[in-house]
C-alpha cells in the first residue's frame, strides 16, 4: 500500500509537469503532444532499415512515437496528460510500483531510430515513468531508418555516426561536425578503427553521463553543439580521466573555461 500511495503521488507530479509543458507549447504555438515519426517521414526520405536488436536506448534521445495512436495521452516531454483515476493512470502507477520495487522495469520497449532520435512503437508508458525518474537508459529493440544521403552537414555527420557505431555501440556520440569520431578515438588514446570493449564502453558511458549532466546544468541544450561536441572541445584541454576525478563543481568550472569554444561550434567551420 505504501508503494501504491507513493506511485499516485509521483503520478500527480508527472501530470503537473505534463500539463505545464502542454500549456507552454500551446502558448508558444508549438505542437503540444509527442512527435509522430510516421508524420515526419515520406517514402523519398528513407534509404532502408537496419535491425539493431536489443540495445540500451538513451532516455533523453527518445522524442516521440512511431504512429499517432494515443499521443494525446502524453505531453511533448512524455509526461502524462490523463487523470490519475483513468485506466492509463492506473497502468502508469503499476509501472511506477515496479520501478520502485525489487522487480524494476525490465521489459524492453520497441522503437525506431531516425537521425539519432528514437520513436516508440511499444512501451510509451515505460518511457514516461523512466523519464519522470530521470533514468539514463532503457533496453529496447531498435530498427534504424536510414535517411537518403545528401551532402548536408547533418546527414554527413549521421552517416559518420552509422559508420563508427559498430565500434562504440553508443548512441550518446552524436556530433555536429564531420570528422569528430576519429578525433574522439585519438583523444581517448585509441586507433581510429579501435573496437571498444564492454568495459571501455561502460567506463566511457558512466563518465560521459557525468559530463553531460554538468553540460546540461549550464543550459548546454540551448546551444547548437551537442554534449558530444562539448566533450571533444573539453578534451583538447583536459584528459578524459579527469571527468571522474573532479568534483561536480570542478567539472562545471572546467566546462565553463572552454564555453566560448563550445558556443562557437554553431557557426564555425569544422574543427
Where are the regions that the model predicts?
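Short, charged/polar connector segments at secondary-structure boundaries
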Residues: 1-115, 121, 132, 174-189, ...
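Glycine-rich loops and low-complexity Gly/Arg-rich segments
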Residues: 87-89, 133-136, 144-147, 163-168
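Short phosphate-engaging motifs
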Residues: 126, 180, 207
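Charged, amphipathic alpha-helical linkers/stalks
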Residues: 149-198
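Long, charge-rich alpha-helical interaction segments
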Residues: 199-205
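Extended alpha-helical scaffolding regions
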Residues: 206-209, 213-216
Amino acid at each position: 500500500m505504501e508503494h501504491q500511495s507513493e506511485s499516485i503521488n509521483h503520478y500527480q507530479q508527472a501530470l503537473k509537469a505534463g500539463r505545464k509543458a502542454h500549456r507552454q507549447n500551446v502558448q508558444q504555438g508549438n505542437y503540444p503532444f509527442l512527435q509522430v515519426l510516421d508524420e515526419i517521414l515520406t517514402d523519398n526520405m528513407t534509404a532502408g532499415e537496419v535491425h539493431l536488436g536489443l540495445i540500451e536506448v538513451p532516455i533523453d534521445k527518445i522524442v516521440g512515437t512511431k504512429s499517432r495512436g494515443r499521443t494525446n495521452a502524453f505531453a511533448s516531454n512524455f509526461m502524462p496528460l490523463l487523470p490519475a483515476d483513468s485506466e492509463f493512470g492506473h497502468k502508469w502507477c503499476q509501472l511506477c510500483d515496479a520501478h520502485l520495487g525489487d522487480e524494476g522495469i525490465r521489459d524492453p520497449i520497441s522503437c525506431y531510430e531516425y537521425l539519432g532520435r528514437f520513436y516508440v512503437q511499444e512501451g510509451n508508458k515505460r518511457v514516461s515513468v523512466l523519464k519522470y525518474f530521470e533514468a539514463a537508459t532503457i533496453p529496447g529493440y531498435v530498427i534504424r531508418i536510414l535517411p537518403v544521403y545528401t551532402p548536408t552537414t547533418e546527414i554527413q555527420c549521421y552517416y559518420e555516426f552509422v559508420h563508427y557505431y559498430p565500434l562504440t555501440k553508443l548512441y550518446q556520440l552524436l556530433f555536429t561536425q564531420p570528422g569528430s569520431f576519429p578525433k574522439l578515438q585519438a583523444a581517448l588514446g585509441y586507433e581510429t578503427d579501435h573496437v571498444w570493449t564492454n568495459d571501455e564502453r561502460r567506463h566511457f558511458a558512466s563518465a560521459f553521463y557525468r559530463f553531460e549532466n554538468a553540460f546540461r546544468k549550464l543550459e548546454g541544450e540551448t546551444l547548437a553543439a551537442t554534449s558530444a561536441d562539448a566533450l571533444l572541445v573539453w578534451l583538447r584541454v583536459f584528459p578524459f580521466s579527469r571527468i571522474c576525478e573532479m568534483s561536480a563543481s570542478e567539472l562545471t568550472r572546467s566546462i565553463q573555461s572552454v564555453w566560448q569554444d563550445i558556443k562557437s561550434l554553431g557557426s564555425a567551420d569544422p574543427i
